[in-house]
């Protein structure tokens, strides 16, 4: 993956978000997200997957782990915003990631509407979409892209 400049990556992400009609700053592929994290020292990756997913599927080194929903009930975390504000500066560039990009989209929308001006969604998420055999980790996603992760 060719390393773009931070401003190139962020303007591409912003253009993508506008094309998709997203209310937050931008949408990045996993590879672009990793580049942004390398180029912007204050940037934070917020992994909103459940504890179970982190423990059983894998974690990203250095990510802020903050459940959007809890397993097994999948109830929304009522303290999400308070926990986010406690752990991540509202001025920071914040990248939200989940399994496939759906919960992280919701988290980015909430954060963006709550004073976080630089919210980005990691498209494809950690595991990517299901393939023709209904399995993940083969089409897109952080892990499939060969980016750093470790077993929970």
Task: Name these PLM-found stretches.
Residues 47, 101:
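Conserved G/P- and acidic residue-centered "switch" motifs that form tight phosphate/ATP-binding loops
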Residues 96-97:
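Short, surface-exposed ligand- or partner-binding patches at beta-edge/loop junctions that are enriched
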């Amino acid at each position: 993956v060719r390393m773009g400049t931070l401003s190139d990556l962020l303007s591409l992400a912003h253009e993508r978000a506008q094309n998709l009609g997203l209310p937050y700053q931008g949408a990045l592929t996993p590879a672009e997200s990793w580049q942004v994290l390398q180029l912007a020292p204050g940037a934070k990756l917020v992994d909103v997957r459940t504890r179970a997913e982190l423990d059983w599927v894998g974690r990203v080194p250095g990510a802020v782990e903050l459940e959007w929903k809890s397993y097994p009930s999948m109830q929304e975390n009522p303290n999400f915003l308070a926990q986010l504000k406690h752990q991540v500066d509202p001025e920071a560039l914040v990248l939200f990631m989940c399994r496939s990009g759906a919960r992280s989209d919701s988290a980015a929308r909430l954060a963006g509407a709550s004073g976080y001006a630089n919210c980005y969604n990691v498209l494809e998420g950690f595991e990517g979409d299901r393939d023709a055999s209904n399995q993940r980790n083969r089409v897109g996603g952080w892990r499939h892209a060969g980016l750093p992760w470790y077993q929970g």
